[in-house]
Amino acid sequence: MLSVSEVNRRIAGLLERHFALGWVRGEISNFTRAGSGHWYFSLKDAGAQIRCVMFKGRNQYADFTPREGEAIEVRALVTLYEARGELQLSVEAIRRAGLGNLYEAFLRLKAALEAQGLFDAARKRPLPRHPHAIGVVTSLQAAALRDVLTTLHRRAPHVPVVVYPVPVQGAGAAERIAAMLDLVNARAEVDVIILCRGGGSIEDLWAFNEEPVARAVAASDIPIVAGVGHETDVTIVDFVADVRAPTPTGAAELVSPDRARMLRDVAGCWDALSATLRRQLDRRAQTVDWLARRLRSPQAQMRERRAGLAHLEGRLRFALHGRVQRAEHGQRLLAMRLDAARPDIARERTALQGIEAALARAMRATLDRAQTRLSHHQAGLELLAPQRTLERGYAVLLDAKGQAIRDPAALHARARIEARLARGAVDIEIAQVQPKLPEM
């Protein structure tokens, strides 16, 4: 009985004896450069493919590095990788055989679309800075979808995400992607579209190199960000899309506003607004102080009016006293003249009574005018009295210390104050402070 290892060794020996070193032509795919420096890739044609390895000691003499989809010729031995029982070509030499069919198709379509202006920068639209909703067109099984959703949730958890599932490789994938893009535009649910899938071979990504997808991207009314494959992968969609991202994660970062940055921007705007309001309040407070210095208080005006009234009263008393003295002096002179002339007593008494009556009338008129002026000034003082002001419907606002409140800036919501009225007082709780009253 043979072991598995023995079977594989015998098969490897048979292959090496029956397949001499020779040239094989095919199209390259799944090219990988290992950390050891070895090259691993597949060589295929329309009907089959085979794995190939070209060790570092051989590939260092190659004059080019193979690319996906490129047609090449290799000089190789048919061998068996015994550890896994896999058939492979051990490549000794490599040379170009011209561009592969896929790559030629890629170049033809690229040239045609570029000539039609589909790659022009002028037709590309800017991405919305703050999208209301983000659409993702990809396969539900794609690993890229998980990366995109994780990135969007981290950066912009407040933005809704709509996933539009569609196959991204295989037969008919291009037509279904194009139809889905048309549907997304018709539904108009999102502000920006991420068209993405993860990395893979040129065959895996080929749907994004087909004309239906390219034209659907160009016809979209909604901006599209292409995030197809890895950074080194280039597809037709990358040229037609409004923005090309190196990876699906990069596409998610491009379309999502950074929540932390937005919060910093809002904080900055709030600080600027607060500073502006503080400056305005400071200027208004300065204006109020300036007006307060110019405005005399009612108490000061009352003191001035009282002083003026006292001055008028003194002048009135002095004037009355002088008139009385002059009248008495005149009376004495008349008496002396009467004694000297010895007039008729009755006639002179009558004249004297007339003079006394005239003097009395003059004194009463003078006193009436003085009383009128005194009443006028008294009425003016009463108008300025705080009690009369309160009786006209006004109120005096006092803080907790009993001080009059002149500036609303000294108050705050829920503060308690006292309103002094003509016939009592009222306790008030502040609901809202308005720094400036509306014009009346």
From Swiss-Prot:
GO molecular function, one term: nucleic acid binding
InterPro entries documented for this protein: Exonuc_VII_L (IPR003753), Exonuc_VII_lsu_C (IPR020579), OB-fold_nuc-bd_dom (IPR025824)
EC number, UniProt record: 3.1.11.6
Keywords: Cytoplasm, Exonuclease, Hydrolase, Nuclease
Catalytic activity: Exonucleolytic cleavage in either 5'- to 3'- or 3'- to 5'-direction to yield nucleoside 5'-phosphates
Principal localisation: cytoplasm
CDD domains, per the entry: ExoVII_LU_OBF
Protein localization: Cytoplasm
GO CC annotation terms, alphabetical: cytoplasm; exodeoxyribonuclease VII complex
TM stretches of this protein: none
Role description: Bidirectionally degrades single-stranded DNA into large acid-insoluble oligonucleotides, which are then degraded further into small acid-soluble oligonucleotides.
Subunit (UniProt): Heterooligomer composed of large and small subunits.
Family according to the record: Belongs to the XseA family.
Alphabetized PANTHER family for the sequence: EXODEOXYRIBONUCLEASE 7 LARGE SUBUNIT
Protein name: Exodeoxyribonuclease 7 large subunit
Provenance organism: Ralstonia nicotianae (strain ATCC BAA-1114 / GMI1000)
Gene assigned in the entry: xseA
